[in-house]
Design a protein with these regions (language model features):
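Noncatalytic regulatory segments and standalone regulatory/sensor domains
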Residues: 136-150, 156-206
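Structural recognition of the beta-strand scaffold that forms the well-ordered cores
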Residues: 22-24, 100-102, 121-126, 157, ...
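Short, flexible beta-strand-to-coil junctions
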Residues: 124-131, 200-204
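A mature extracytoplasmic/lumenal domain signature
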Residues: 27, 104-106, 126-130, 160-162, ...
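Active-site-adjacent structural segments surrounding the nucleophilic cysteine of cysteine proteases
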Residues: 1-85, 128, 136-142, 146-149, ...
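Mid-length scaffold segments of soluble, non-membrane domains
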Residues: 74-110, 114-118
Length: 206
């Protein structure tokens, strides 16, 4: 690979056959294992706060805020998913020796430079197989606001850069370590609200 490019050595975990919609949890488990906090993805998923969406008689849909809980169940194929703050909380609750922080509006380039290059893998929200997202199920949040689920929502671990492409650990379908065109992944990450979670041992950065 090109000079100055690095890829972190993160052991791969697949969500296939165990957590069909648990990409966020399986990605988080890869990061926790990287920091020697050994945990099975299924054990982590058991501790994930989750809530189902429901329909009333008129067909109106009500559901939780994916910034607060996992929507549905990661153990099922019809689970939806959750956003960065839920995983940040999950890491706080299960690995108190680690510090986790949700980051918004950083570019992947910034995450790579500020964290990956310093030995810190980053959880990023993107799309399954780099597909485009599209508006999915619509429901009313507890706040009364209307929320539209972004189809193909996914979470992977950004671990490096190789030959000018991003390197990620992709829990989907046993995909393993993948390299993705930078512009493509930048776009998909952007389409999911440019959200990420960094996890570091306390006192790791001066």
């Amino acid at each position: 690979s090109k000079t100055g490019e690095i890829t972190l050595d993160v052991d791969y975990l697949s969500q296939e056959g165990i957590l069909p919609t648990g990409c966020e949890t399986v990605s988080a488990a890869m990061v926790l294992n990287y920091w020697q906090q050994e945990i099975l993805p299924t054990d982590l998923a058991e501790q994930l706060p989750s809530e189902n969406i429901r329909w009333d008689e008129s067909g109106k849909c009500y559901g939780p805020d994916p910034n607060e809980v996992f929507v549905g169940s990661p153990f099922t194929t019809w689970g939806y998913g959750c956003f960065a703050p839920v995983i940040e909380e999950l890491i706080h609750d299960t690995a108190p020796l680690l510090e986790a922080e949700t980051l918004y509006d950083r570019t992947l380039e910034q995450l790579y430079t500020d964290y990956v290059c310093r030995g810190v893998p980053v959880l990023i929200w993107c799309t399954i197989c780099q597909l485009k997202t599209s508006p999915g199920t619509v429901w009313e949040l507890p706040s009364g606001e209307t929320f539209t689920w972004p189809n193909n929502e996914h979470c992977m671990v950004l671990v490096g850069q190789q030959n000018g492409r991003w390197v990620c650990m992709d829990p989907y379908n046993g995909n393993g370590r993948i390299t993705v065109d930078k512009d493509l992944l930048d776009d998909r990450y952007d389409s999911m609200g440019s959200q990420a979670v960094v996890t570091i041992p306390g006192g790791f950065f001066p």
